[in-house]
Each structure stands twice: as structure tokens, then as C-alpha cells.
Curated annotation (Swiss-Prot):
Belongs to the NARF family. One of its GO terms (molecular function) is 4 iron, 4 sulfur cluster binding. The lineage of its organism: Eukaryota, Metazoa, Ecdysozoa, Arthropoda, Hexapoda. SUPFAM superfamilies: Fe-only hydrogenase. Keywords: 4Fe-4S, Iron, Iron-sulfur, Metal-binding. Pfam families: Fe_hyd_lg_C. This is Probable cytosolic Fe-S cluster assembly factor CPIJ010948.
């Protein structure tokens, strides 16, 4: 069963496979067509040879990359086979083993600096799976990665904080100067972004926030900021992220996040909660408790945080709506909001918070999780009946804590019960404050060093691309 979010899964299933469901990447053939025909033979080594009047010619294997799939209007299932090899635990272990061997043989030119970035949601998923406190879980996961050969193990908090700050600034600017692009839609969910690009294209893309997701902000920090601090070339760093959903693999593979200057991706490999569980099981670690703990690294400032697992009150997907609501209330209307009350609407995955002044609603925010609510919101937008200013929108029901690659429930527990426990655990964690010393240092020494906002725009923001569907006669069902 596919673990991609519902927004990316194939829904039109029947016995007729149309080109939109198959891989429809066109193959460019350089050779001219032969008027006399040709003969193709398979050699003993498995290669293909084409015999023509001009002689024998070895045929090259057709390769379709994940980037090709992202630029195609076909369904996302076409990419799953590629993901297995390019973004998998097998590929990660292969790289780690090769790197350890290069270190052992003193082949310094072949050694890469390996950085693991771990999101909050996988830590909570693993904590529930192995019945450990969240902070201890992170330390033992760090110990496991260190044993594999990791050089640094960091959390995503600094990238989460930057995403919140850039998101709030973008919202205030739109509210004051460009209200036709409201509601602003959160951009951290790659499942929703990919769905929007392929299904609704140029209509919906202006509404999506340009702020990068925390994963891709972290990619910039590791490959550009941290690389400079450590004196390491960006292409010598192998950056691994641990995320709660498979859609993050697609996000990391977008061409927007490949640097032509450094000739490398911001994120080289994405693995998920369930893959970490499989890796532990595969290495004979049946209980995370037996893994030796290791400290989480903090290269961003001199002051080390007291904890490394943080939470938000409103949602398990990063707290975008809660933080932006509080900031907008204070910045735009001079109202201090200590607690944002999100009320359920049609279902628990669609919630709303409002700010009123003199009996008038001046701010209306929503949290919309799951494909059903995404579709409803899009239809409201198209009919001009969407009166929200901001929507935290996630493809998975219940958001990122219930991501498609989170560890499955055991012992007869339902998915709903497990998700409720994860949400309660997330809300019990120390509240994150994005305005802190580390964030200020990154802005001062890196992003604002040039004296303007160009680096902020280049490194913390992105753009989206409508993907037109290819209509051919083969789409006709007889």
C-alpha cells in the first residue's frame, strides 16, 4: 500500500490504464529511423544491440529520474519505484558503509561529512513505539545514527522557527498590500503543493506561501551556512532528513532545491519514521532502549537549548496557524492573544479561529487537514466564497503527526487512538518560541549579512510551477 498522502495517491482505478496513470515521460531518440528496419538482440551480459545496415550499435538504457516524474502530469505512483532506490534506507546504508570504508582506508577525497536532521514528529512516533520519553528517544536515535557513522545529528527547530518568522512576515505584507492573494495557504506540505501544481495549476499557486518548508530551509542552512562555518564544500556534505511522510522525498527532489553552483541538492536523502523502525529491526535492535545515548548537536549559537523536542498547542504540523494568528493580532490590531481557540467545524480536521473587534471579524484562520477538506477549500476559493485570511493546510488527516510514514499502531490499537496519543504528547511538550538567539544569529551573520533582503528571498523562499496535463487520444475510454 502506498504511504504517500491522499492528495498524491492514484484514485481512478480500473482495468484501463490511461497515459495519465502510466509513466508518460517522452523518450528522446537521437538515431534516425531506418528505412530498411533493424534487428535488436540481447547479448550474454544483458545489454541490447541494434543491428542495422550501418552495423551494430549498443542501445542505451532509458532512465527516468524522480525529477522527470515531478515535471510530468502523470500520477505520482510512477515515481515510487524510483524513490525505492534514490530515497531509501538501502541507499542511505550504502552511502554510510562506503563513507566508513573510505575513512578506514584514509581515502580523504572520498570521505563525506554526514549530517542527520530529525523532525519532531518521527521522534514522537518512535517514542510511542518504544515506550520512551521523547527527549530520551531523540538521544538514543542520535546514538544510533552516530554508530552508523553520522558526523552531526541536529533537530529541525531552527528551520521551524525561520519558517514561522518568514511566514508571519509574508502574511503581514499580503494583508497590508496584496489582499487578492488571501487566504494565504501554508506551504510546508509537499503533498498539497504537488497536488496544487498538477491539479489546479496557475489558479491556486498565487495563494500558496512562498516560504520554504522547514526541511528545505534546513537544507540551505546545512549546505550553505553550516558548510561555511565548518569550512567544508557543500557537495562534500551528505544531508539526511528524517521526516513523517513520504511526500518529503518528492520535495527534496524538486529541481528548485538543486544548486547549480554547488552541484548538489539541499537534501540528499529523506528517510521516514517507519524506515527508522525497519533499520533498527534489520540491525537486530528490537528495543531502542539498548542503544547508547548521544548528545544532539547544536552548531547554531553558543547557548544550548535545555531540550530538543518542542511542541505547539494548536496542531501537530508546526503550529503555523497559532503563531501567525497571535502575531497578526498583535501587529495589525494591537491585540495580545495568549491562547488561540480553534473550534471544530464539520469535522475535527477542519477548525477555525476568529478575532473580533467591535463586533466585526477582523481575522479568520483555519486548519484544514486531509484531502477531503483540501478539495472543499479549493472549491470555495474557485467560487469566491472562501472568507479566510490564512489556512494551515496539510494533506494527511490529523496533519503531520499522522503522516503516511509514521509508525503503525500495534496491539489492537486503532490509528485514531494512536494519533490522539501523539497529539496529547505533542501538546505536553515545552512550547517553542521562534524569536531566540540562534535565529537572530542566523539572520545577522548569514541572511542579512549583505544588508538587504535578497538572501532571505533566495534561501528562505521558493516558487511553484503549474504542470499542464497532456491530453492525447489514448485517454479515450472505449
Amino acid at each position: 500500500m502506498s504511504r504517500f498522502s491522499g492528495a498524491l495517491q492514484l484514485t481512478d482505478l480500473d482495468d484501463f490504464i490511461t497515459p495519465s496513470q502510466e509513466c508518460i515521460k517522452p523518450v528522446k531518440i537521437e538515431a534516425n529511423k531506418s528505412k530498411t528496419g533493424s534487428k535488436i538482440t540481447i547479448q550474454d551480459d544483458g545489454s541490447y544491440m541494434q543491428a542495422t545496415s550501418s552495423g551494430l550499435q549498443k542501445l542505451e538504457k532509458v532512465e527516468i529520474t524522480l525529477a522527470d516524474c515531478l515535471a510530468c502530469s502523470g500520477c505520482i505512483t510512477s515515481a515510487e519505484g524510483v524513490l525505492i532506490t534514490q530515497q531509501s534506507q538501502e541507499e542511505l546504508l550504502k552511502v554510510m558503509n562506503e563513507n566508513n570504508l573510505a575513512k578506514l582506508n584514509n581515502q580523504l577525497d572520498a570521505v563525506r561529512f554526514i549530517v542527520f536532521t530529525v523532525a519532531q514528529q518521527p521522534i514522537l512516533s518512535l517514542a510511542k513505539r518504544y515506550n520512551l520519553p521523547a527527549e530520551e528517544t531523540f538521544e538514543r536515535v542520535a546514538g544510533y545514527f552516530r554508530k552508523l557513522g553520522a558526523d552531526l545529528v541536529v533537530d529541525t527547530k531552527i528551520a521551524d522557527d525561520l519558517a514561522l518568522i518568514e511566514g508571519r512576515n509574508e502574511f503581514i505584507e499580503r494583508f497590508n498590500t496584496n489582499r487578492q492573494t488571501l487566504p494565504m495557504l501554508a506551504s510546508s506540505c509537499p503533498g498539497f503543493v504537488c497536488y496544487a501544481e498538477k491539479t489546479h495549476g496557475s489558479f491556486i499557486l498565487p495563494y500558496i506561501a512562498s516560504t520554504r518548508s522547514p526541511q528545505q530551509i534546513m537544507g540551505v542552512l546545512v549546505k550553505k551556512y553550516l558548510a561555511k562555518l565548518l569550512g567544508i564544500a557543500a557537495d562534500r556534505i551528505y544531508h539526511v532528513t528524517v521526516m513523517p511522510c513520504y511526500d518529503k522525498k518528492l520535495e527534496a527532489s524538486r529541481e528548485d532545491f538543486f544548486s547549480d553552483v554547488e552541484n548538489c541538492r539541499d537534501v540528499d536523502c529523506v528517510i521516514t519514521s517507519i524506515e527508522i523502525e525497519q533499520m533498527l529491526d534489520g540491525s537486530g535492535v528490537q528495543a531502542l532502549q539498548i542503544v547508547e545515548k548521544a548528545p544532539i548537536d547544536w552548531p547554531w549559537s553558543t547557548g544550548r537549548p535545555p531540550v530538543f523536542v518542542w511542541g505547539h498547542e494548536s496542531s501537530g504540523s508546526g503550529g503555523y496557524s497559532e503563531y501567525l494568528f497571535k502575531y497578526a493580532a498583535r501587529k495589525l490590531f494591537n491585540v495580545a492573544v495568549d491562547h488561540v481557540e480553534f473550534k471544530n467545524l464539520r469535522n475535527s480536521d477542519l477548525r477555525e479561529a476568529v478575532l473580533e473587534q467591535n463586533g466585526e471579524v477582523v481575522l479568520r484562520f483555519a486548519i484544514a487537514n486531509g484531502f477531503r477538506n483540501i478539495q472543499n477549500m479549493v472549491q470555495k476559493l474557485k467560487r469566491g466564497k472562501c472568507n479566510y485570511h490564512y489556512i494551515e493546510i496539510m494533506a494527511c488527516p490529523s496533519g503531520c503527526l499522522n503522516g503516511g510514514a509514521q509508525i503503525r499502531p500495534t496491539g489492537g490499537q486503532s490509528q485514531r487512538e494512536l494519533t490522539a496519543e501523539l497529539e496529547a504528547l505533542y501538546r505536553s511538550l515545552p512550547a517553542s518560541n521562534p524569536e531566540n538567539e540562534a535565529v537572530e544569529m542566523v539572520y545577522t551573520t548569514f541572511l542579512d549579512n549583505a544588508g538587504d533582503n535578497n538572501m532571505r528571498k533566495e534561501f528562505l523562499h521558493t516558487s511553484y510551477h503549474p504542470i499542464e496535463k497532456m491530453n492525447t487520444a489514448l485517454n479515450i475510454k472505449w
